[in-house]
Amino acid sequence: MKTIQEQLPNDLVEEILCRVPATSLRRLRSTCKAWNRLFKGDRILASKHFEKSAKQFRSLSLRNDYRIFPISFNLHGNSPSLELKSELIDPHSKNSAAPFEISRVIHCEGLLLCSSQLDESRVVVWNPLTGETRWIRTGDFRQKGRSFDVGYYYQKDKRSWIKSYKLLCYYRGTKYFEIYDFDSDSWRILDDIIAPRGSIGYSELSVSLKGNTYWFAKGVTEERPRTISLLKFDFYTEKSVPVLLPYQSRRLFQASSLSVVREDKLSVLLQLDQSSKTEIWVTNVIDETTKGAVSWTKVLALDLSPHLQIGNDGSFFLGEDKKVVMFCEKLIDENKVKDMVYIVGEDNVVTEVGFGVDEMDGCRAVILNYVPSLVQIERAGGNRKRGH
């Protein structure tokens, strides 16, 4: 007797499987070899699954001891709390005599780009759900202090449009940029991606949304040469365009931060000055066909106490109902630095929760959105494997 899978056309089976959440399908793959073959080595199908499946939105934290943990928030009741789950350890670092100490993480649709301020000779792109990794050598550069971002563009394949990934490497506050192509396994220098007087040294934060990278930048528009705006880098054109903020003529913010909402919108945290409310804005739409066309909606305006200091590099994200926001910041007390998460709602009541370890050294702790996916990491030359 034929199994159900054998009785159904492959196209229909694929369509059904593409509706199953990634974590559930991951378990099913281990019990059905035929279903496992549908996804193993098929980047197009894995990408199609990400576009059509129900998303499972999770949270991750990078602690100041260079370790990544899933984190869950309990926002019900009168005492909000958080819980750190088991540490995520990529296979290479777990078995290596010299572990890779991650100090910066960028999330891009289920993939994590991890870099280290202690070892800038390499970065790793990692899918925590599947365990797949790709280590990339970054070469010898003039000085330390580089940042790396990941994104993609679509290119035509024999069967469909597929995502092709790239890395962007840069020194903040300079005009030096390089780009890495996953398929060709090569780096090259980029010129003129920002305005002559522009700078992305304003903040260390960046986020990835729909394949593009966003930063805070200064001096990137001719009309407002000294003001702060958002800058979007397009990995297809390899150019950047300014994206106007809700406040378009500011030379300085008391606090500013970036986040992504449910993988389809940008969110910014802005505080104009020390006496102003802390505002959370979310994009309604970002017009991909015109330069910087965007509209914003203010979803929260918080009147925080002066002792709660939010800087330009602290991370945050919104709760699903956009009524609660979580900030991650450092609390400096004498000779100790502790990572804190502040949970704040519309009532302005602040819940402080410490996590991580008390250390003066270490990386900046962050919290970030994460969506488990079966997206496969592009190998050099298409499907060819290569060593690390």
Swiss-Prot record:
UniProt xrefs under CDD domains: F-box_AtFBW1-like (cd22157)
Consequence of gene disruption: No visible phenotype, probably due to the redundancy with ETP1.
Induction: Ethylene treatment has no effect on RNA, but down-regulates the protein levels.
Boundaries of every F-box domain copy: 2-48
PROSITE patterns in the record: FBOX
Pfam families: F-box, FBA_1
Subunit structure: Interacts with EIN2 (via C-terminus).
More about this protein: Double knock-down mutants of ETP1 and ETP2 show an accumulation of EIN2 protein and a constitutive ethylene response.
Annotated NCBIfam families: F_box_assoc_1 (TIGR01640)
Function text: Negative regulator of EIN2 protein stability.
The protein, known as: F-box protein ETP2
Source taxonomy: Eukaryota, Viridiplantae, Streptophyta, Embryophyta, Tracheophyta
